[in-house]
Design a protein with these regions (language model features):
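Cysteine-centered iron-sulfur cluster-binding motifs in ferredoxin-type domains/subunits
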Residues: 304-320
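The feature marks the mature, well-folded catalytic cores of soluble enzymes
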Residues: 1-305
Length: 320
């Protein structure tokens, strides 16, 4: 679904009158705040951690050209391929060209705000390529033909009754409001999509330049499936996601996990360095990393707006 500017006023008016939506968002917001406070309460110096997180990003931005060149070299050394995209159009073209080269008919995706930024799903649909969101919230939003409403909880605006009706209508399953049963419906449906997919597409929480490693955080396991079952893995990240070292990674891991969900670390932490190697029995045959600028290099040099690129996509809405 593409939300046009003229529709926003109407949508906002409808949402303002929706009491169920108000209750759903209020409950979810309280839950996020509680988890975050509990997570940071376990640290001796949470403010110091935030300062170190900002220092990591400052160093990365100050050395960005060098780090990006190093990242490209290390990814290439590991058997991967790096592509440079100046804007959204070029990123779409690169990924669609890869899909054509590998004869891709079906794609599974991990949750990625970057693919939303470039409008990738619509581009696939126009080419007749089947694409499935595999994050539970994104899957719900896709079935409803909506856009994500939250950076880490895409379907935060829907309650279990709405999801139950949606699954019954779109997937032809019996109506149930039991969360475990609804989750199993999604799991069974998506398992078939994983097994039949030719390409997996993800974003990335970080890229560690010194080893050429893509870092992915998640709590559901769908991203790991999307990166290990299809024969081709394409990762799309903004150039601001690169950090130099594993020490830098450790600082941001601690900060992001606690801020997003009050966790010491995510349930699944995937560290991907190139495609599968000879003798390995899982993982993709090919790994492609698409580095997207799309105005980021200009923003990094802007004293007013550069803070927007310090964002870790952690739900706090306040960059370190």
């Amino acid at each position: 679904m593409e939300l046009r500017a003229k529709e926003i006023k109407k949508k906002a008016s409808e949402a303002a009158r929706n009491e169920v939506l108000h209750q759903t968002l209020s409950s979810a917001g309280d839950r996020f705040v509680g988890l975050r406070e509990a997570g940071f309460s376990q640290l001796n110096d949470p403010d110091g951690l935030r300062i170190r997180g900002r220092q990591v990003k400052e160093r990365s931005f100050a050395n960005l050209p060098r780090l990006l060149r190093l990242l490209e070299k290390k990814v290439t050394d590991a058997g991967g391929v790096v592509h440079w995209a100046e804007d959204a159009s070029e990123a779409r073209s690169i990924i669609l060209d890869l899909a054509g080269r590998y004869g891709v008919k079906s794609v599974v995706k991990g949750k990625s705000m970057m693919t939303e930024e470039i409008g990738l799903n619509r581009a696939f649909s126009r080419k007749g390529i089947e694409v499935w969101e595999t994050d539970l919230g994104e899957f719900i939003v896709q079935l409803a033909d909506e856009i994500p409403s939250h950076i880490i909880a895409p379907a935060i605006h829907k309650n279990k009754e709405e999801v139950a009706r949606l699954f019954s209508e779109k997937l032809g399953v019996p109506y149930t409001v039991n969360p475990e049963e609804l989750t199993m419906v999604a799991r069974r449906t998506l398992r078939e999509k994983f097994l039949g997919a030719d390409m997996g597409i993800t974003g990335g929480n970080m890229a560690v330049a010194e080893t050429g490693t893509l870092v992915l955080f998640e709590n559901e396991g769908n991203i790991r499936m999307a990166t290990s079952l299809p024969r081709v893995h394409v990762a799309l990240i903004g150039i601001e996601k690169v950090v130099e070292s594993w020490d830098d990674f450790g600082v941001l891991l601690t900060l992001l996990s606690r801020s997003a969900a009050g966790q010491k670390m995510p349930t699944y932490l995937s560290l991907i360095t190139g495609p599968s190697k000879p003798g390995e029995h899982d993982g993709p045959e090919a790994f492609h990393l698409v580095l997207l600028d799309n105005g980021r290099s200009r923003i990094i040099g802007d004293e007013v707006f550069r803070d927007s690129l310090f964002c870790l996509r952690c739900n706090l809405k306040q960059p370190p």
